[in-house]
C-alpha cells in the first residue's frame, strides 16, 4: 500500500522512518498558509492541515495521503515560522521564561476517500533565556522556517524546563497518534 507524505518538512520524513514507514512519495502541497483575520491558532492549524490534504483531493487515488501542520503559540498569538533573523530573535524573547503550546494537526485520507483527523498539543516551558543564549542559538540557523523559531531536537532542547505531552509532536509529527490514525485508516 502506497503512502504519500504531503509535506515539505524533512523532520516528518525522519519521524515516519522511526515507525519503519517510508512514503512512496514526498510532495510539498503548494497552498496559501496565510492566517485569516480573527483566526485562533488551533483553528488555523486544523485548517492548514486540511487544506494541504484538499490539495491532493483528486490525485493519488491509489494511495493513502498524510498531511500535517505544526504551530507554536502563546494564548491567542501564533509564533509563526520565519526566515527573518530579527523576528526569530523576538520570538525567542517572547518564549523566554514562559509556557507555550505546540500543536500538530494531522489529516489522513485512506483508499476509500475517508478522512481521519487528529490534533495533538504539547505544553513546553522555556527557561529564562539570556541574550547570549539567544545569540548563540541564532548562529545555529536552527530557527529558520520552523514553528516557534526553534528545533527541540537541537541546541534549543537545553532551553526546555519542562515538556508536557508528545516530544515528537514538537519535532513535527506525534508518532503515537500518527501510528494509530494510520491503523484506523487501514494503512498496512
Where are these regions (language model features)?
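N-terminal beta1-alpha1 ligand-phosphate binding loop
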Residues: 2-21
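A short beta-strand-loop structural module common to alpha/beta enzyme folds
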Residues: 23-34
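Flexible, glycine-rich phosphate/dinucleotide-binding loops
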Residues: 12, 33-35, 115
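Cofactor-binding loop segments of dinucleotide-utilizing enzymes, especially the Rossmann-like FAD-
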Residues: 8, 29, 111
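Glycine-centered loop/turn motif at secondary-structure junctions
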Residues: 20-23, 186
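Anionic-ligand binding patches
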Residues: 3-4, 40-188
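Short loop/helix-cap segments at secondary-structure boundaries that form the rim of catalytic
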Residues: 15-18, 36, 58-59
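A structural micro-motif
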Residues: 1, 22-24, 63
Amino acid at each position: 500500500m502506497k503512502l504519500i507524505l504531503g509535506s515539505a518538512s524533512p523532520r516528518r520524513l525522519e519521524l515516519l522512518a522511526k515507525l519503519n514507514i517510508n512514503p512512496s512519495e514526498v510532495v510539498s502541497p503548494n497552498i496559501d498558509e496565510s492566517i485569516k483575520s480573527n483566526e485562533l491558532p488551533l483553528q488555523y492549524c486544523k485548517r492548514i492541515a486540511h487544506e494541504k490534504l484538499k490539495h491532493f483531493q483528486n490525485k493519488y487515488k491509489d494511495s493513502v495521503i498524510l498531511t500535517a501542520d505544526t504551530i507554536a503559540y502563546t494564548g491567542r498569538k501564533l509564533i509563526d515560522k520565519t526566515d527573518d533573523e530579527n523576528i526569530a530573535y523576538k520570538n525567542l524573547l517572547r518564549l523566554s521564561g514562559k509556557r507555550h503550546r505546540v500543536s500538530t494537526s494531522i489529516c489522513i485520507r485512506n483508499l476509500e476517500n475517508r478522512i481521519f483527523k487528529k490534533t495533538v498539543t504539547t505544553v513546553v516551558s522555556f527557561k529564562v533565556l539570556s541574550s547570549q543564549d539567544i545569540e548563540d542559538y541564532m548562529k545555529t540557523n536552527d530557527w529558520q522556517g520552523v514553528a516557534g523559531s526553534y528545533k527541540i531536537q537541537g541546541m534549543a532542547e537545553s532551553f526546555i524546563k519542562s515538556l508536557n505531552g508528545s516530544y515528537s509532536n514538537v519535532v513535527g509529527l506525534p508518532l503515537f497518534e500518527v501510528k494509530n490514525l494510520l491503523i484506523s485508516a487501514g494503512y498496512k
